[in-house]
């Protein structure tokens, strides 16, 4: 079906997605990827046999959906080229199950939001002033983002230090975001230190572009990324 046959609307339909990706990771990755185009109301991805490899993203504005439609066509997502079109109707993303399950889905979303708030509170308690600046086994040391006036921020270089990541963030989620900018090399995460990561580019001018573009970007509705240069 040609996307041109369907009028623009708030919901984009994504297909040719990697079926091996777990449902929750898929939803989080799609949220992180699509949030740069506008405010997201919902991401729906089900693992039933008929709906594998597909997802729906509902934006608050048609213009946001249009930007995603244009920007994500053929995007390399978990090793497969994404196919994007507008949903036939908004109900395409809401009627994927029998209507009687709607209250259950609503309760599930409310529970997920409550769990996310709880995780944020726990992460805030665990993140002491030294958590982000300790040596971490990667050969780099995180800059402290000005937490102490005695320690100046690291000078520009090709490696970015990312903080305030939700605990469920994966390296693939970050790769999907940062590989959109020229010169991307790799993402490094530390299993023993959730919530932080290092992203390497070919040179400092390329890392600066990515930093400026993604500073404060929210991988989830509650976690704006804090980006600085890594200390070598």
UniProtKB/Swiss-Prot annotation:
SUPFAM superfamilies: RNA-binding domain, RBD. Residues 10-89, 158-232 form the RRM domain. The keyword Cytoplasm applies. Keywords: Cytoplasm, mRNA processing, mRNA splicing, Nucleus, Repeat, Ribonucleoprotein, RNA-binding, Spliceosome. PROSITE patterns: RRM. Residues 108-123 have a biased composition (Basic and acidic residues). GO terms for molecular function: RNA binding. One of its GO terms (biological process) is mRNA splicing, via spliceosome. One of its GO terms (cellular component) is U2 snRNP. It comes from the Eukaryota. Residues 90-159 are annotated as: Disordered. The keyword Amino-acid biosynthesis does not apply. Residues 127-151 have a biased composition (Polar residues). SMART domains: RRM. It is found in: Nucleus, Cajal body; Nucleus, Nucleoplasm; Cytoplasm. InterPro entries: Nucleotide-bd_a/b_plait_sf, RBD_domain_sf, RRM_dom. Belongs to the RRM U1 A/B'' family. PANTHER family: U1 SMALL NUCLEAR RIBONUCLEOPROTEIN A/U2 SMALL NUCLEAR RIBONUCLEOPROTEIN B. Component of the spliceosome where it is associated with snRNP U2. Involved in nuclear pre-mRNA splicing. This is U2 small nuclear ribonucleoprotein B''. It comes from Oryza sativa subsp. japonica. The lineage of its organism: Eukaryota, Viridiplantae, Streptophyta, Embryophyta, Tracheophyta.
């Amino acid at each position: 079906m040609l996307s041109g046959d369907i009028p623009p609307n708030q919901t984009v339909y994504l297909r040719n997605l990697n079926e091996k990706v777990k449902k929750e990771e898929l939803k989080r990755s799609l949220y992180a990827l699509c949030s740069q185009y506008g405010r997201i109301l919902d991401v729906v991805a089900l693992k039933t046999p008929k709906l594998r490899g597909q997802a729906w993203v509902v934006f608050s504005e048609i213009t946001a959906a249009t930007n995603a439609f244009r920007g994500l066509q053929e995007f390399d997502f978990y090793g497969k080229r994404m196919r994007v079109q507008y949903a036939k109707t908004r109900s395409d993303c809401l009627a994927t199950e029998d209507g009687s399950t709607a209250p259950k889905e609503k309760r599930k979303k409310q529970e997920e939001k409550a769990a996310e708030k709880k995780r944020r509170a726990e992460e805030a308690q665990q993140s002491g002033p030294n958590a982000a600046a300790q040596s971490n086994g990667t050969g780099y040391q995180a800059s402290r983002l000005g937490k102490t006036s005695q320690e100046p921020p690291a000078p520009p270089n090709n490696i970015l230090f990312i903080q305030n990541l939700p605990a469920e963030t994966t390296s693939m989620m970050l790769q999907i975001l940062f590989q959109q900018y020229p010169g991307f090399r790799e993402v490094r995460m530390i299993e023993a230190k959730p919530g932080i990561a290092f992203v390497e580019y070919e040179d400092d001018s390329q890392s600066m572009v990515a930093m400026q573009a993604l500073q404060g970007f929210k991988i989830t509705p509650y976690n704006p990324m804090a980006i600085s240069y890594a200390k070598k």
